[in-house]
Amino acid sequence: MDLQTQLQELKTSTQAKLAEMRGEHSKELQELRVAVLGKKGSLTELLKGLKDLPSEERPTVGKMVNEVRDVLTEAFDEAAKVVEAAKIQAQLDSESLDVTLPGRQVNLGNRHILSQIAEEIEDIFLGMGFQIVDGFEVETDYYNFERMNLPKDHPARDMQDTFYITEEILLRTHTSPVQARTLDKHDFSKGPLKMISPGRVFRRDTDDATHSHQFHQIEGLVVGKNISMGDLKGTLEMIIQKMFGAERRIRLRPSYFPFTEPSVEVDVSCFKCGGKGCNVCKNTGWIEILGAGMVHPQVLEMSGVDSEEYSGFAFGLGQERIAMLRYGINDIRGFYQGDVRFSEQFK
């Protein structure tokens, strides 16, 4: 039998065997591939016969060998796909799924308590006609300090209190720069400016139960004609009562902030004793909660606002402070440690 006939028979017989392969024949398929195309396989043995052919026949037979090899290689690849698909289908047919079984329980997360507090406060202010304005966490010395009427020698500008990146660039110590930038652009012909600016702020504090090198503030600003201290008090009373209950009262104590004049500390009647005196309020009946005041005329003038025609008030409160008072939390570090046992209490 000549070599060409043997090649044709090898191709035909191999294709016939491949056509019979099923899902359970994956092992047999691999064995057949090795027997036909392997280093010691049938095709390799036939190739050895090329050297015995006359020189004029070798190119034709050699070409036929390559064609047979290509055809069989492709046939084996296709058979492997068929066998694998049949194997998978057999597995699917043999297994059943009980659709009445309960699904796996998914552990859902929840909003962080600080996010909840921020959203609650923002919703209150939106209902009062305020706008919410975000700003840069990396600020210039000019907007963070000078525009807030903080002179160069003010203690708050000391390196111990502020994270400086360069001599003129720093991590903001409050969200007041957002107010200054907004005040610069506001068109008072369209009405007064009413805004809050929430966000993270940074101080060079040593972390302990009541201090953190970063925390969250929400600062508010209202500027318009005939804005008075009475407007400030009424606004703060509404906020405190919505946050802590309608029975809460506030009081204003004189204080000092460079960017407000006059300035006040705002206290709220104790949540625990109702103002009678207890360990929470240190027997005073009051708890300090935020700082506020009338916008300093110089701050208005630096934004090009006529302080003779316009006035305003500003205030700032901390989200952590609100949460700690509302829920009786004693350690501010709990907000940042990612302990699920802590955070899941506030679902």
Curated annotation (Swiss-Prot):
Localisation: Cytoplasm
GO molecular function: ATP binding; catalytic activity, acting on a protein; magnesium ion binding; phenylalanine-tRNA ligase activity; transferase activity; tRNA binding
InterPro entries xref list: aa-tRNA-synth_II (IPR006195), aa-tRNA-synth_II/BPL/LPL (IPR045864), Phe-tRNA-synth_IIc_asu (IPR004529), Phe-tRNA_ligase_II_N (IPR004188), Phe_tRNA_ligase_alpha1_bac (IPR022911), Phenylalanyl-tRNA_Synthase (IPR002319), tRNA-bd_arm (IPR010978)
Amino-acid biosynthesis found in the keyword field: no
Any one GO BP annotation for this protein: phenylalanyl-tRNA aminoacylation
Entry's cofactor comment: Binds 2 magnesium ions per tetramer.
Cellular component GO terms, alphabetical: cytoplasm
PROSITE patterns in alphabetical order: AA_TRNA_LIGASE_II
One Pfam family from the record: Phe_tRNA-synt_N
Residues holding Mg(2+): 261
Swiss-Prot/TrEMBL keywords: Aminoacyl-tRNA synthetase, ATP-binding, Cytoplasm, Ligase, Magnesium, Metal-binding, Nucleotide-binding, Protein biosynthesis
EC number of this enzyme: 6.1.1.20
Cofactor(s) required, per the database record: Mg(2+)
Source superkingdom: Bacteria
Catalytic activity: tRNA(Phe) + L-phenylalanine + ATP = L-phenylalanyl-tRNA(Phe) + AMP + diphosphate + H(+)
Family annotation (SUPFAM superfamilies): Class II aaRS and biotin synthetases, tRNA-binding arm
Subunit (UniProt): Tetramer of two alpha and two beta subunits.
Family, per entry: Belongs to the class-II aminoacyl-tRNA synthetase family. Phe-tRNA synthetase alpha subunit type 1 subfamily.
Protein's UniProt name: Phenylalanine--tRNA ligase alpha subunit
Organism per entry: Streptococcus thermophilus (strain ATCC BAA-491 / LMD-9)
Gene: pheS
